[in-house]
């Protein structure tokens, strides 16, 4: 993820001191990553996708109540893709494509490899340990591993996607260095991004649905169209000079997102009750087209509205917030093993899953950021994380 320490604003917005951090971007990352940790805690205790350690509730009421949170999680990482695209455009404007690509390989590729071959393995080991399976640590490495399942990117599919988009962007600008962002207005480019997400998602979902855990290395291909569209939208804003071309429409987009989300929820309820929920992801019928169109609209409208809200309402910084902002990327990379360790530590208390969820979430969020901050104090690590 690009560093907000870079000068990434339009000429008339350049801060007085070079290298000044964009505090609103730090705050946005802290909030989104904290939500990711809480969501992954919920999947272990309340339902949803699989986690390294699970102690699921048997209450259908809690599982049903968790569904809206799962629906929101579909759009949770959108702001990070948008901001990453914006940072990438401003960064590439100050360095050649080769240098930009090398920096992305260092800051995204290296953590991804460490996660796949170290962090994910340790999290799987801790999860099995929490289930009293008495695992042997060495069995979690090998070709293939004897324990812990195959190697996978897991929760770092976001980093894998961002690395792919960043390298593709560098290649594009090397072949065609002159940006064309000024030819489009903000509403036009947002409409184009929503349409791009809708079309590519419709094609991708024919093979891989949202949250499909059976993809290669759990890459979550069904999520990539949204990420690509929002990254491209951020790039456009960066090349145009300022995010204001998008965020100025924040209030209207908030209402647009709410309206589209209401229609999307109504469609989901209708399909669920009629037993045709799967039909909204396959084929070329009107249900599929309506589903992907609403998905594209919500992806863009919610992301830009949320980003505008953070920029307007939460742009300040204090000592604790600044440290959390600097540690946010490391916290995201490490949260799988930290969160699983906390879950295993509380497993012996034999509490109700619902209560354990609340306790673990409260403890794990600050611990993940603390682990990220501590890791960055190791010499050389801050250049990567």
Which residue ranges define each predicted feature?
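Alpha-helical transmembrane segments and their immediate juxtamembrane cytosolic regions
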Residues: 2-385
């Amino acid at each position: 993820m690009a560093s907000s320490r870079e000068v990434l604003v339009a000429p008339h917005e350049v801060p007085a001191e070079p290298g000044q951090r964009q505090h609103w971007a730090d705050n946005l990352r802290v909030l989104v990553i904290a939500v990711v940790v809480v969501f992954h805690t919920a999947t272990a205790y309340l339902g949803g996708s699989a986690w390294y350690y699970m102690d699921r509730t048997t209450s259908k009421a809690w599982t049903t109540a968790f569904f809206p949170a799962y629906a929101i999680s579909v759009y949770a990482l959108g702001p990070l893709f948008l901001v990453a695209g914006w940072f990438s455009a401003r960064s590439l404007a100050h360095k050649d494509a080769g240098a930009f690509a090398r920096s992305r390989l260092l800051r995204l590729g290296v953590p991804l490899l460490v996660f796949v071959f170290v962090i994910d393995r340790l999290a799987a080991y801790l999860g099995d340990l929490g289930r009293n399976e008495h695992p042997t640590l060495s069995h979690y490495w090998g070709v293939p591993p004897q324990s812990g399942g195959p190697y996978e990117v897991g929760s770092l599919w976001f980093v894998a996607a961002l690395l792919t988009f960043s390298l593709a962007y560098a290649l594009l600008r090397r072949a065609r260095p002159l940006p064309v962002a000024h030819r489009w207005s903000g509403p036009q480019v947002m409409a184009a991004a929503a349409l791009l997400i809708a079309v590519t998602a419709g094609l991708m979902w024919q093979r891989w649905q949202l949250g499909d855990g059976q993809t290669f290395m759990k890459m979550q291909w069904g999520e990539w169209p949204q990420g690509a569209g929002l990254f491209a939208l951020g790039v456009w804003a960066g090349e145009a000079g300022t995010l204001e071309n998008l965020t100025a429409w924040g209030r209207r987009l908030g209402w647009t997102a709410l309206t589209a989300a209401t229609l999307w929820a109504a469609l989901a309820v209708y399909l669920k009750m009629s037993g045709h929920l799967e039909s909204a992801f396959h084929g070329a019928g009107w249900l599929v087209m309506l589903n992907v169109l609403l998905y594209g609209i919500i992806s863009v409208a919610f992301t830009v509205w949320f980003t505008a809200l953070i920029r307007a309402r939460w742009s300040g910084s204090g000592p604790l917030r600044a440290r959390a902002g600097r540690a946010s990327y490391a916290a995201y990379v490490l949260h799988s093993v930290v969160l699983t360790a906390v879950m295993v530590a509380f497993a012996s208390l034999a509490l109700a899953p619902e209560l354990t969820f609340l306790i673990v979430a409260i403890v794990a969020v600050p611990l993940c950021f603390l682990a990220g901050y501590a890791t960055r104090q190791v010499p050389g690590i801050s250049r990567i994380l």
